[in-house]
């Protein structure tokens, strides 16, 4: 698969496995610092309120950022690791994860596509090619992230998500 195809594959599976369904609030290509020379984009951002029936439930919500990395050049590019939310994940093929596992910042998690019938550890040791026919993929957390402090206000991030649309 080519880089563009891998990015589309990872994005589509992230949306269907992690971002879709009732009570999911997310946007793609969320721009931060819009209108400045330092504009940054987060591939996907999700808002996870503790509930939606009261102001306090909404205000206790957290944000999750997902940055899609399709290959080593993409990972090393220096672009797209804009982690400003409480939870931050890199989304990448298992092959790439194997190569960069030692370089990943301690608080950042990793999500990889894993065939539904395979164990994460087995997939790590012997990754399945993404273009393998007949495979049902699931996006799995292979490295949990640590919850940290948000670097932007809730209002700002919600506005940026709203401006991005889906």
Model segments located where?
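Active-site beta-strand-loop-beta-strand hairpin of nuclease catalytic cores
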Residues: 37-65
């Amino acid at each position: 698969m080519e880089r563009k195809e891998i990015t589309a594959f990872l994005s589509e599976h992230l949306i269907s496995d992690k971002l879709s369904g009732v009570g999911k609030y997310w946007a793609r290509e969320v721009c931060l610092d819009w209108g400045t020379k330092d504009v940054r984009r987060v591939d996907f951002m999700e808002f996870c309120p503790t509930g939606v029936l009261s102001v306090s439930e909404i205000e206790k919500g957290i944000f999750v950022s997902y940055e899609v990395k399709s290959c080593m050049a993409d990972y090393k590019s220096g672009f797209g690791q804009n982690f400003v939310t409480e939870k931050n994940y890199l989304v990448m093929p298992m092959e790439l994860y194997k190569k960069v596992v030692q370089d990943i910042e301690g608080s950042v998690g990793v999500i990889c596509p894993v065939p539904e019938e395979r164990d994460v550890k087995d997939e790590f040791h012997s990754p399945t090619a993404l273009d393998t026919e007949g495979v049902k993929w699931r996006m799995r957390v292979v490295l949990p992230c640590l919850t940290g402090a948000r670097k932007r206000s809730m209002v700002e991030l919600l506005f940026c998500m709203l401006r991005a649309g889906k």
